From Swiss-Prot:
It comes from Californiconus californicus. The modification 6'-bromotryptophan is found at W17, W36, W37, W43. This is Mu-conotoxin-like Cal 12.1.1e. Expressed by the venom duct. Mu-conotoxins block voltage-gated sodium channels. This toxin reversibly blocks voltage-gated sodium channel in cephalopods, with no alteration in the voltage dependence of sodium conductance or on the kinetics of inactivation. The keyword Disulfide bond applies.
Length: 44
């Protein structure tokens, strides 16, 4: 699934969160979370 919800500057969906200002860019793409760009998950 695609990360499509912005919460507090982070994109959160399906257990992942993505920092739009991360060094490698936004880890969310049309295919979902690009896990190797994500700094962590909301479960951490």
């Amino acid at each position: 699934d695609v990360c499509d919800s912005l919460v507090g500057g982070h994109c959160i969906h399906n257990g992942c969160w993505c920092d739009q200002d991360a060094p490698h860019g936004n880890c969310c793409d049309t295919g979902g979370c690009v896990w190797w760009w994500c700094p962590g998950t909301k479960w951490d």
